[in-house]
A protein has these predicted regions:
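Short, flexible, mixed-charge acidic loops at enzyme active sites
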Residues: 15-25, 101
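Non-catalytic N-terminal targeting/anchoring module and adjacent flexible stem/linker
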Residues: 122-130
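Conserved donor NDP-sugar-binding/catalytic core segment of glycosyltransferases
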Residues: 1-18
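Conserved nucleotide-sugar donor-binding catalytic segment
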Residues: 28-115
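Intrinsic disorder/low-complexity detector
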Residues: 12-14, 96, 128
Length: 130
């Protein structure tokens, strides 16, 4: 798996704050477990399809990419690209710009559940290694 970076722009491709989104909140230097502390691994993402087929995606409409990313980094390193690969255009009415507090809370609860399941799996894996 590889996670890249992108640049935030307006509809006319003028840079918008915060500019480049490179997901430096988690890096190889701070370890795979740091991915459990963030609310997503970022975009864009690319997956090694043969491995992905052995893991599978959760059958949900939110957070499935995060769940798979956590599962992958349990055993494999995730590659990083810090240079922007594309521009992400933002404008008023963008679908992810105005989520209700109820939707944000539901999304966060689900991601907390994903982290809990992954943490439990890592504890089991480490116990079996002893």
């Amino acid at each position: 798996m590889v996670v890249g970076a992108y640049e935030m722009t307006d509809f006319d491709l003028n840079p918008l704050p915060p500019g480049i989104i490179d997901h430096r909140e988690w890096t190889e230097e701070n370890g795979c477990n740091n991915a459990l502390r963030v609310n997503g691994l970022g975009a864009p993402r690319a997956f090694f399809v043969p491995l992905l087929r052995t893991i599978g995606f959760p059958n949900v409409s939110y957070g499935e990419d995060y769940a798979v990313g956590l599962r992958i980094c349990r055993e494999y390193r995730i590659g990083r690209i810090y240079e922007p690969l594309y521009c992400c255009r933002r404008w008023e009415g963008n679908s992810d710009a105005a989520l209700s507090i109820e939707r944000v809370n539901a999304n966060n609860i689900y991601k907390d559940s994903i982290r809990t399941w992954e943490l439990e799996a890592r504890i089991r894996m480490n116990a079996n290694d002893e």
